[in-house]
């Protein structure tokens, strides 16, 4: 079923192999009168919340409707790259800290902290190992990257996966909040493969 769903989506032109790298975005929060944001050549290094470009070279931009088909079929790995809130260093002694959960698209893997423009060596290792594991070493496994509407974290993470040789990278700019706005379900999640 999963292989058939991928073949169907490829033949319908919903995956990278069936379309040029330019895509279209559904549920954009950028006003129609705003000038489109140009795709930079490098990573976004700061001010991660803000209008994003409508494209990502080498990736297929997917709409909510397209992602729903992928999600229901299980044909792609959904990767939420929203950063994880860190324990404040100045908490008063004796304060109990509980790592917050995140609500994202059910079945997603939350790869926290991999969408920054510059990654620590530890974050690079975590990201590479996680992609290797979730793709089962198949560089053509469909990988969908998202975080929130108008957030560069997913754009950066998807760009990095492309640079590492992943060939079926999909980018979902509306993020978990765009998914929720479409009245689709969210589920609580914790970071994938991290010690909490």
Language-model-detected regions and their locations in the chain:
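Glycine-rich nucleotide phosphate-binding loop and flanking beta-alpha elements
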Residues: 85
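Rhodanese-like catalytic fold shared by cysteine-dependent sulfurtransferases
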Residues: 2-9, 13, 17-64, 70-73, ...
């Amino acid at each position: 079923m999963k292989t058939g769903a991928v073949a169907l989506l490829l033949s319908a032109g919903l995956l990278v192999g069936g379309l040029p790298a330019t895509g279209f975005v559904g549920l954009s929060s950028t006003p129609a009168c705003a000038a489109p944001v140009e795709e930079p050549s490098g990573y976004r290094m700061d001010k991660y919340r803000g209008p994003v470009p409508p494209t990502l070279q080498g990736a297929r931009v997917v709409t909510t409707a397209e992602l729903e088909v992928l999600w229901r079929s299980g044909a792609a790995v959904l990767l939420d790259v929203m950063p994880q809130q860190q324990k404040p260093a100045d908490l008063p002694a004796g304060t109990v800290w509980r790592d917050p959960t995140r609500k994202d698209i059910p079945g997603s893997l939350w790869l926290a902290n991999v969408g920054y423009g510059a990654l620590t060596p530890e974050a690079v290792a975590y990201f590479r190992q996680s992609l290797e594991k979730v793709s089962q070493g198949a560089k053509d496994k469909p990988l969908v990257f998202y975080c929130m509407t108008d957030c560069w974290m997913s754009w950066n993470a998807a760009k990095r996966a492309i640079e590492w040789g992943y060939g079926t990278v999909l980018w979902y700019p509306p993020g978990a909040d765009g998914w929720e706005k479409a009245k689709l379900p969210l589920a609580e999640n914790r970071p994938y493969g991290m010690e909490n």
